[in-house]
Swiss-Prot record:
The reaction(s) this protein catalyses: RNA(n) + a ribonucleoside 5'-triphosphate = RNA(n+1) + diphosphate
Subunit description: The RNAP catalytic core consists of 2 alpha, 1 beta, 1 beta' and 1 omega subunit. When a sigma factor is associated with the core the holoenzyme is formed, which can initiate transcription.
Cofactor requirements of the protein: Mg(2+); Zn(2+)
InterPro entries: DNA-dir_RpoC_beta_prime, DNA-dir_RpoC_beta_prime_bact, RNA_pol_asu, RNA_pol_N, RNA_pol_Rpb1_1, RNA_pol_Rpb1_3, RNA_pol_Rpb1_3_sf, RNA_pol_Rpb1_4
Residues noted as binding Zn(2+) 2 in the record, renumbered to the chain: C814, C887, C894, C897
Entry keywords, A to Z: DNA-directed RNA polymerase, Magnesium, Metal-binding, Nucleotidyltransferase, Transcription, Transferase, Zinc
UniProt binding sites for Mg(2+): D460, D462, D464
Family of the protein in this entry: Belongs to the RNA polymerase beta' chain family.
Alphabetical list of SMART domains matching this protein: RPOLA_N
GO molecular function, one term: DNA binding
Gene: rpoC
Chain's role: DNA-dependent RNA polymerase catalyzes the transcription of DNA into RNA using the four ribonucleoside triphosphates as substrates.
Cofactor: binding comment: Binds 1 Mg(2+) ion per subunit.
Protein name: DNA-directed RNA polymerase subunit beta'
Length: 1408
């Protein structure tokens, strides 16, 4: 048995651990680390440069300076290893022990550890239930603490000031004991009985009902519990012994010129030792109390600054007024241990150089300069030369390489064959920023890069540099080839579209040869194959753009993989016919038989990838690139200033605008419009003018008139170079062409507001001085923005990666039935993202049935392009799919809930790090987003005041949740608040959807057909009507003093306006005017179908449009409430908006939502607030207080559902989660984030955002504890609570209840289970303090922790390794358990030994 345990012990090498635990160090522990006490502040002798004995660099304590050599030189050489020199006391061993041997300082008095004192919340303060101020008063010798009151009336632990202490001494003499400093605090901490205290707090928690008290108690209880569980003792937060860092980690290096550079820590240690020695001497001399006290305070301060300089009081500075770097500073921040050395290391076998274009390379190649290759592959070359017998020793080989003999180059050729290298361009924003290529040796000093991978690297050739890395081991080479090769990364992980797409001159060349020209040379000829066309072109019988007829015979493969042979004659052009040569077999000619713009090329490549697979796609992409370069060279497109056409009607358009502006200025001068209206109108006019000029310019640019073969004049698409460049997608856009040939338009000031005088000139005409000055205004802001944006975007990416890093695909199926519903994404009434795009690559959670009820797709199927098209054609408009949000896997996520791996086009593999992929996909386009906050003004405000809904597509009308009544004029009036109208196409799919506001007039009936341009409904955009649903006679109530009459001078009509409460007298302040309906007999009329009397309360400022005793019918308007223009808030756009969403920030003025479902009423108002009361069906009432200045969107007697918005504003995500649940929250965040990215034309798949939201929802708040060990009100990990509940429900006990909590990404990262990961992210001090106090264990499950401890990450190829290790250790434990439980020991013993040996071998193999 002993042998066996010994054997197992041997296996437990220090590098083979599964968890890392951090706890408080006891004084004994610190002494056990130490190799001796540091007694003197001296470092080295200034003459001999040898370390001083007992000093900070003492060789006796820390080990020898030179390998195997003692300090005095008595023992030298390896043979004396382990001897301790009797003269100088140094052990003869390797000098590297100076990196690991620690020393210690025995402190003359106890000192508090600043981290546990000042890192909020103060742990010492929580433990003692005292405030930080009180503790600091004791620690820094400003107050006494009663340690033992004896028989005096003083309280134990009472604080006494100096005077009070002296008074007490006079009164009671020596009957009591009071102390100051850390000793007093230490005594107090020692006196705490943790178990008894915990029990007392638990009882107190049950007894109290006050929320604040409960919170306070739970905080303390948590701390005490963590002390009990971790085995830490509270008094260890006070130090008696200070450990001293090994000297090599705080080096002292001689500079030339006889000076020394030293680590700041040495200075800090010196101060501590000096003060400690002085204090010891003072204590020996029995110095007066006040001197000793002062020295103790100074010692406390010097230990504080050594541990964390600047945390308390002024930071200690060195000679050059620079703050000294303390121990805490060593580990935190970008330059700290975590981020500088553990997460980012420098590597050997790497180099960097400028990149230049390599148009003749193939996609998997890169050009590597010979010089670089020779340097990078040196060790390989040496070994090859030796193997060949060309060199006898490494030294000889080295010489050969230095001389540059011809044999060396031959060997180099052999070495690099099939040996991939990695190319990386900083900043590496997503995983495509590092890719593997096969090197091709080239002359020169620049790396040649294949043009098609530029978009993945975001590289251009204006002086960019790239780094080269050599994968050394066989495994590394294998991974580089199979996973990182550029030919294996054709699709973007963000959206699944091809990322290897031609751009710029390649696109231009392809576009050029696929254009057609009317009446070009040889038009109408017929050819039997592309070779004939080539010969005709060579013979100059036809032109590249000539329209011809071509006989084709091709094999076409469709989505389902079915081959069909197509024959026939097609109309095409010479250029397109030539492209037939490179078209892969299986694709139809119709993919290339059109103008090849960038979009069309992308479509062709996508089709090729889906139908023929990656290999064909790579070849096709390369061939397209060669053709594009060839033809853009032959075309020689360039442009001159005459190509930028200025439209003839530009001048009259601008004149008209000037007249309109003058007219508005005149109205303003007469006081007819306000300053704001004038500004908005002017900006509107100029925006509109700019559009008109652009439109007219584009019409001139886009078409040119030519004569066809019959001699008629016809229009054809223009061959203007500028237009061709923009139309093909090679370079430039309409916006840029507008500035060249139209007008520059309105400019913005740096604060985002628009300057109302536009630049009417364009760049071809040239700008005058004023216009030039205005344009520099905006341009400078643009440059400043870009710099800020890069930093902000990088920080967002960092936070996203940190929160999502440990989401890895860990199992095939979590077995959940939960799902989310996917529907087309509608914005502004139009479908911006179709259903088929949203569900592609998802797994369906329920059978999908067509309109006729037959099942199209079965539950659990992964949707590919074919199935998605099937669903689309069958007219299904919503599909339930699995999502990362609903996945129930405890650690990580399952394949089924994630679906397709976008970068590979098939089901995601086990071990795929989908979290990091999600974070990179969201973060990478961050730099393309805008930074500005939009002030609504000008064009934006014009679009907000909508007053009707127009149909855009023809189709069938469908009402959704609409309540309507007919009024006396037979118009249909809408009386619902959340009603919508959809337009369905012939298959019943939703094409458009519109919200129809309360009080609109409907022009259509449910189910009728409409065509585009039909108006569905109209309403007044500036007022909100109150509409009667019953008919009867008007009777006013509470009008006296609360309502004033206005008589219109022109018409003589009277209207009643409700006064605001500020304008009323105190007697009428509380009155609430209302209108009620009575019948002929004076009885009150009820609402139709109810017993409730028809009363309409009138809010402030509403204008009553009926008079006393008027007769009204259902659907008539009683009053109008003017809508304030308070809706023009600033819209946060771009990057800040995305950051706000992911940080789950509460908006400035959040929308207030109904907490329960029921009927709205208003209660008694307070001074600044109105009281909204919702009465539930059960009769219970729920009250909400709303500030007076917020406009309430609902009216008395109206029914609301839980989660409906009652006060307008930006929704608060926490409210959405609480009231509407996880799915609605996910939908909100996904839609909002997508809106920002869509505005910039960036496509990101929803599931990336869902993955991040999943991580934001990791925590729950415990509502009731049940029979678990949780504490009420604490935040716990969702997976852990589920696990505990499973455990107690199996035992038949009560489960804990909880509520999901939404955390922002920064908070979620810091709240992760792994303290190593959290500490390396932000707030290192706080995280480590907390971890140490609670004795946290890091199970090393995430990626980051494993990188930090230098392991393979548990993802990708490391996933299998970790799995094997886990299984092996589980097996060993099982065997050991069985072994302990059996009687027949010897038999099992042999078995276990064999098992263990085989298990360890298998682990070793996996590691290798």
């Amino acid at each position: 048995m002993k042998d066996l345990l010994g054997f197992l012990k041997k296996q437990n090498v220090s590098s083979d651990f599964d968890t890392i635990k951090v706890t408080l160090a006891s004084p004994e522990k610190i002494r056990s680390w130490s190799f001796g006490e540091v007694k003197k502040p001296e470092t080295i002798n200034y003459r001999t440069f040898k370390p001083e004995r007992d000093g900070l660099f003492c060789a006796k304590i820390f080990g020898p300076i030179r390998d195997y050599e003692c300090l005095c030189g008595k023992y030298k050489r390896l043979k004396h290893r382990g001897v301790i020199c009797e003269k100088c006391g140094v052990e003869v061993t390797q000098s590297k022990v100076r990196r690991e041997r620690m020393g210690h300082i025995d402190l003359a008095t106890s000192v508090a550890h600043i981290w546990f004192l000042k890192s909020l919340p103060s742990r010492i303060g929580l433990m003692l239930d005292m405030t930080l101020k009180e503790i600091e008063a004791v620690l820094y010798f400003e107050a006494f603490m009663v340690v033992d009151p004896g028989l005096t009336p003083l309280e134990p632990w009472q604080l006494l000031s100096e005077e009070e202490y002296l008074d007490a001494m006079d009164e009671y003499g020596d009957e009591f004991e009071a102390q100051m400093g850390a000793e007093a605090i230490k005594k107090m901490l020692q006196a705490i009985d943790l178990d008894a205290e915990a029990t007392r707090l638990r009882e107190e928690m049950e007894a109290t009902s006050s929320e604040t008290k409960q919170k306070k108690i739970s905080k303390r209880l948590k701390l005490i519990d963590s002390f009990v569980q971790s085995g830490n003792k509270p008094e260890w937060m006070i130090l008696d012994v200070l450990p001293v860092l090994p000297p090599e980690l705080r080096p002292l290096v001689p500079l030339d010129g006889g000076r020394f550079a030293t680590s700041d820590l040495n200075d800090l240690y010196r101060r501590v030792i000096n003060r400690n020695n002085r204090l010891k001497r003072l204590l020996d001399l029995m110095a007066p109390d006040i001197i000793v006290r002062n020295e103790k305070r100074m010692l406390q301060e010097s230990v504080d600054s050594m541990l964390d300089n600047g945390r308390r009081g002024r930071a200690v500075t060195g000679t050059n007024k620079r703050q000294l770097k303390s121990l805490a500073d060593m580990i935190k921040g970008k330059q700290g241990r975590f981020r500088q050395n553990l997460l980012g290391k420098r590597v050997d076998y790497s180099g960097r150089s400028v990149i230049v274009v390599g148009p003749s390379l193939r996609l998997h190649q890169c050009g590597l300069p010979k010089k670089m290759a020779l340097e990078l592959f040196k060790p390989f070359i040496f070994s090859k030369l030796q193997k060949r017998g060309l060199a006898t020793t490494i030294k000889a080989a080295k010489k050969m390489v230095e001389q540059g003999l011809p044999e060396v180059w031959d060997v180099l050729d052999e070495v690099i064959r099939e040996h991939p290298v990695l190319l990386n361009r900083a900043p590496t924003l997503h995983r495509l920023g590092i890719q593997a290529f096969e090197p091709v040796l080239i002359e020169g000093k620049a790396i040649n890069l294949h043009p098609l991978v530029c978009s993945a690297f975001n590289a251009d050739f204006d002086g960019d540099q790239m780094a080269v890395h050599v994968p050394l081991s066989l495994e590394a080479q294998l991974e580089a080839r199979t996973l990182m090769m550029s030919t294996n990364n054709l699709l973007s992980p963000a959206n699944g579209d091809p990322i290897i797409v031609p751009s710029q001159d390649v696109v231009l060349g392809l576009y050029y040869i696929t254009r057609e020209k009317i009446n070009a040379k040889g038009e109408g000829k017929a050819f039997s194959n592309w070779m004939e066309v080539q010969r005709a072109l060579d013979a100059k019988a036809v032109h590249v753009h000539t329209k011809i007829k071509l006989k084709i015979e091709e094999t076409v493969i469709d989505d389902a993989g079915v081959e069909t042979v197509k024959k026939g004659i097609v109309d095409t052009t010479v250029g397109r016919a030539l492209l037939l040569r490179i078209l892969p077999k299986g694709l139809g000619f119709d993919l290339l038989n059109l103008n090849l713009t960038k979009k069309n090329i992308s479509k062709a490549l996508n089709a090729c990838y889906r139908i023929l697979g990656p290999k064909e796609t790579v070849i096709f992409a390369d061939q397209l690139m060669y053709a594009g370069f060839k033809w853009s060279t032959l075309a020689g497109l360039s442009f001159c200033s005459d190509d930028m056409l200025i439209p003839d009607d530009k001048a009259p358009i601008i004149e008209r605008a000037d007249e309109q502006v003058t007219e508005i200025q005149r109205q303003f001068a007469q006081g007819l419009v306000t300053e704001g209206e004038r500004y908005n109108k002017v900006v509107d006019i100029w925006s509109h003018t700019n559009e008109l000029v652009t439109k007219s310019m584009m019409e001139e640019l886009q078409y040119e008139t030519v004569t066809d073969a019959e001699g008629n004049e016809v229009k054809q698409t223009s061959f203007n170079s500028v237009y061709m460049m923009a139309d093909s997608g090679a370079r430039g856009s309409v916006a840029q062409m507008r500035q060249l040939g139209g007008m520059r338009g309105l400019m913005a000031k740096p604060d985002g507001s628009i300057i109302e005088t536009p630049i009417t000139a364009n760049f071809r005409e040239g700008l005058n001085v004023l216009q030039y000055f205005i344009s520099t205004h905006g341009a400078r802001k643009g440059l400043a923005d870009t710099a800020l944006k890069t930093a902000n975007s990088g920080y967002l990416t960092r936070r996203l990666v940190d929160v999502a890093q440990d989401v890895v695909v860990t199992e095939p199926d979590c077995g959940t039935d939960a799902s989310i519903t996917m529907a087309p994404h509608v914005e502004g009434g139009e479908v911006v993202e179709e259903l088929k795009e949203r569900i592609l690559g998802r797994v369906v959670a329920e059978d999908v049935a067509g309109l006729d009820g037959e099942i199209i797709v079965e539950k659990g199927t992964l949707l590919d392009e074919r199935l998605v098209n099937l669903i689309d054609e069958s007219g299904v408009d919503a599909v339930k799919v699995h999502s990362p949000i609903t996945c129930e896997t405890k650690f990580g996520i399952c394949q089924k809930c994630y679906g397709r791996d976008l970068a590979r086009g098939h089901m995601v593999n086990l071990g795929e790090a989908v979290g990091v992929m999600a974070a990179q996909s969201i973060g990478e386009p961050g730099t393309q987003l805008t930074m500005r906050t939009f002030h609504i003004g000008g064009t934006a405000s014009a679009s907000t005041a909508q007053s009707q809904v127009e149909v855009k597509h023809e189709g069938k009308v469908k009402f959704d949740n609409l309540k309507t009544i007919k009024n006396t004029e037979n118009q249909v009036v809408v009386t619902s608040r959340s009603g919508e109208i959809s337009i369905l196409d012939s298959l019943g799919r939703e094409k458009e959807r519109y919200k129809i506001p309360y009080g609109s007039m409907l022009n259509v009936k449910d189910g009728i057909d409409v065509t585009s341009g039909n108006v569905l409904a109209t309403w007044d955009a500036h007022t909100h009507p109150i509409i009667t649903e019953a008919e009867g006679i008007i009777q006013f109530g509470n009008f006296d003093g609360a309502v004033e009459e206005h008589v219109d001078e022109l018409t003589g009509l009277t209207t009643h306006v409700v006064k605001s409460s500020k304008e009323r007298s105190s007697a009428t302040k509380e009155l609430r005017p209302y209108i009620q309906l009575v019948d002929d007999k004076g009885e009150v009329v009820p609402f139709p179908g109810t017993q409730t009397p028809a009363m309409y309360y009138l809010p402030e400022n509403s204008v009553v449009v009926v008079n006393q005793s008027d007769k009204v019918g259902a659907g008539d308007i009683l009053a109008r409430i003017p809508q304030e223009s308070s809706k023009t808030k600033d819209i946060t756009g771009g990057l800040p908006r995305v950051a706000d969403l992911f940080e789950a920030r509460v908006p400035k003025e959040p929308a207030i939502m109904a907490e329960v479902s029921g009927v709205v009423g208003f209660g008694k108002e307070t001074k600044g607030k109105q009281r909204l009361v919702i009465t539930q069906d059960s009769g219970e009432q729920h009250e909400t207080l709303i500030p007076k200045w917020r406009s309430v969107d609902v009216f008395e007697g109206e029914r609301v559902e839980k989660g409906d918005v009652v006060v307008d504003g930006n929704p608060n995500p926490h409210d959405i989660l609480r009231l509407l649940g996880v799915e609605r929250l996910t939908k909100y965040i996904v839609d909002e984030v997508q809106d920002v990215y869509r505005l910039q034309g960036v496509r990101i798949n929803d599931k990336h955002i869902e993955t991040v939201v999943r991580q934001m929802l990791r925590k729950v708040e415990v509502r009731s504890t049940g029979d678990t060990s949780l504490i009420k009100g604490e935040q716990a990990e969702f997976a852990r609570v589920l696990e505990m509940n499973e455990k107690v429900s199996d035992e038949g006990s009560v489960e804990a209840s909880y509520q999901r909590v939404l955390l922002g990404i920064t908070k979620a990262s810091l709240a992760t289970e792994s303290f190593i990961s959290a500490a390396s992210f932000q707030e290192t001090t706080r995280v480590l303090t907390e971890a140490a106090v609670s004795g946290k264990e890091d199970k090393l499950v995430g990626l980051k922790e494993n990188v930090i401890v230098g392991r393979l990450i548990p993802a990708g190829t490391g996933f299998a390794y970790h799995k094997a290790r886990k299984e092996a250790s589980e097996k060993t434990q099982r065997e050991l358990a069985a072994f302990m439980n059996t009687d027949d020991e010897s038999a099992v013993q042999e078995e276990v030994v064999e098992e263990t040996i085989s298990v360890t071998e298998s682990v070793e193999q996996t590691t290798e």
